[in-house]
Amino acid sequence: MRNGTSANGTTGHAPIARRLFGTDGVRGVANVHPMTAEMALQLGRALAYVVRNGSHRHRIVIGKDTRLSGYMLEQAIASGISSMGVDVMLSGPLPTPGIAFLTESMRADAGVVISASHNPYQDNGIKFFSRDGFKLPDAVELQIEQLVLGESGLEEFHALRPTATRIGKAKRIDDAIGRYVVFLKSIFPKDLTLDGLTIVVDCAHGAAYHVAPAVFEELGAKVIALNVKPDGKNINDGCGAVHPESMAKAIQKHRAHLGLALDGDADRVILADEQGRIVDGDAIMALVGRDLIRQKTLAKRTVVATVMSNLGLERALAGAGGRVVRTAVGDRYVVEEMRRSGYNFGGEQSGHLIFLDHVTTGDGVAAALNVLAVMQREGRPLSELARCFEPVPQALVNVAVKERRPLSDLPEVARVIGSVEKALGKDGRVLVRFSGTENKVRVLVEGTDGKRIRAQADEIADELRKALG
C-alpha cells in the first residue's frame, strides 16, 4: 500500500508530527480553537521569542488576505509580537508570496501571513516565513508549538517581559502593493510585453485584488478583472482557483487569449486557454518544464512535484529529456527538496508553482507571467503549448473522517487497497493519505480506464467511511 509520503518515488524527509501546525501553518474556523485571538497572541509571542537573535532591533512583517476575521487576528498577533519587544510592520491585504518578498527585501526577521488560502471566509490560518522568505522549517514550527502549548522553555519564555521603553512598535508599510508589483514585473523578460493580449484575471475577492490586475495592465495587456470587490465574506465564494468556471466562460465572452484564477492568498493559480479549457498545475509544469529544458535553464533537467501529480507529467517531461522527482504533499516540501538538491522549478497539481530563481514560495501571478513569457517568445497560443501534457485518468475522492488513526491499523482498508493495486498492475497507482489542513482522507486512483478507477476509488472510500467516519 502506498500511503502518504511512503509512496514510491518520493524524496526528502517525512513531515514532523505536530498538534497545531499542519502542512500550511495553523488553520481552523475563525474564533474557534485554535484560530482564536488568544492563540494568535501566543503564536505572536512565541514567534518573536524564537527569532530574537542578536542585538539589533527586531522586526516582523504581518500581512493578510481579505477575510473578516483577519482584522481580529492581525491585531492579536501584532500585540503578541510587540509585547516581546519586537517591532511589527503591517502590509494590509497582500498575497502570501508578497509577504515572503517583503520579509526578505525589508530585512525583517520573520513574516506572518493570516490566511486560509482557498478555504471559505469562515476559516482562517496563520503561517510563518523566515527572514530569507522561505516557510519556517517543521522543526522551528514545532519549537513554537511547544512554547504555545507549554511543553518546553517555559520559564524564560514567560519571564521575558520587556519594560515599557522596550515594547515593540507597529506601523504600516508605505506602498506595500507597489513594491510587490514592481518586483513581479521584473520577473517578466525585459524584451517582451503583453501588448495585444486580452487576459481574464479572477482574483477570488482575495489578497491579489489590487496587485494582479495592475501587473498585467502595466505590462501592456487588456485586463478583464473578475471578483475584485472583497467584503470580508465573499473570498473564494464560487470563484477563484477552486472554481475557475466563471473565468473560463469570461474568456469566451471577451475573446481573451488567456485566463487565470487565483485563490484567496494568490499563492496558486489555475489557467484556461483561449478556448476556455482548464490548464492545471501539472499541465503548467509540463509546458514550462519543457521550455526550460529548451532554454537549458532547468536545473538538472528535473521538475519537483508531489505524489498527487499525474503520471502524464512524467511522460511529458521524459519526452523532452527531463524527469520528475516527487515529494510529500505540500508546497513547503517541494521547496525543501528543491533547495536540498539544487533544483529550480517545481509545484503541485493544485496550482502552487515555485520558480526558485525568482521567488521563495508558490506565487500565482509569477507562474502566470512565466507561462505568458513562453507564449510570447514562441508565438503560440496556450492551447497549443498545453498539448504536450496528456493526463492519465485520475479519480480523487475526499472522505470526511472523525479520527486520524494510522491507515496501517485498518486491515480491511489495507485489504481493499491491496486488491485495487493488484488489479491496476503497472498501469496505475493508488495513493491514500490524510489531508494536512482538513479532517479528511484523500483517495487517489490513477489508471487507464476512467470508469473503472472511479469505482475503485469509491470502493476504498466506502471502506474508510466504515472505519473512520
Swiss-Prot record:
Pfam families: PGM_PMM_I, PGM_PMM_II, PGM_PMM_III, PGM_PMM_IV. GO terms for cellular component: cytosol. The keyword Zinc-finger does not apply. Keywords: Isomerase, Magnesium, Metal-binding, Phosphoprotein. It comes from the Bacteria. It is an enzyme of class 5 (isomerase). Its cofactor is Mg(2+). Activated by phosphorylation. The active site is at S117 (phosphoserine intermediate). GO terms for molecular function: magnesium ion binding; phosphoglucosamine mutase activity; phosphomannomutase activity. The modification Phosphoserine is found at S117. PROSITE patterns: PGM_PMM (PS00710). One of its GO terms (biological process) is carbohydrate metabolic process. Catalyzes the conversion of glucosamine-6-phosphate to glucosamine-1-phosphate. HAMAP family: GlmM_B. NCBIfam families: glmM (TIGR01455), PRK10887.1 (NF008139). Belongs to the phosphohexose mutase family. This is Phosphoglucosamine mutase. It comes from Anaeromyxobacter sp. (strain Fw109-5). The gene is glmM.
